[in-house]
């Protein structure tokens, strides 16, 4: 598979995970705040796991899925802490997808 093809698949997976598979409750409650139905960390972990699963399925590399899970949670945690806004948040996510595509093709030779 070519880099651009894998990158496009990962980007589509990202938008699926961030917009189609993340409901309003998860989007609100993955950040610390009052009146949550579950502790915020549960929501953030679940959201990161969705993204990790998508990356693992698309690349066939569970280790990249685990890396995505952790990196996605850290990026979203930074946004929750108001370290940056949505454009920076999404740019960091997109950059991570480029890194996963490169690693999949160069290191893991998918």
Name these PLM-found stretches.
Residues 1-8, 52-64, 99-110:
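Helix-coil boundary and interhelical linker segments in multi-pass alpha-helical membrane proteins
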Residues 10-51, 73-104:
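Interhelical loop and helix-boundary elements at the membrane-water interface
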């Amino acid at each position: 598979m070519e880099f651009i093809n894998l990158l496009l698949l990962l980007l589509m997976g990202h938008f699926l995970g961030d917009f189609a598979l993340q409901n309003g409750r998860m989007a609100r409650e993955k950040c610390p705040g009052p009146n949550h139905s579950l502790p915020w960390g549960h929501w953030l972990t679940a959201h990161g796991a969705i993204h990790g699963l998508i990356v693992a399925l698309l690349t066939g590399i569970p280790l990249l899925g685990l890396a995505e899970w952790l990196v996605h949670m850290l990026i979203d945690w930074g946004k929750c802490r108001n370290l940056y806004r949505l454009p920076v948040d999404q740019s960091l996510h997109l950059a991570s997808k480029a890194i996963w595509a490169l690693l999949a093709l160069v290191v893991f030779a998918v």
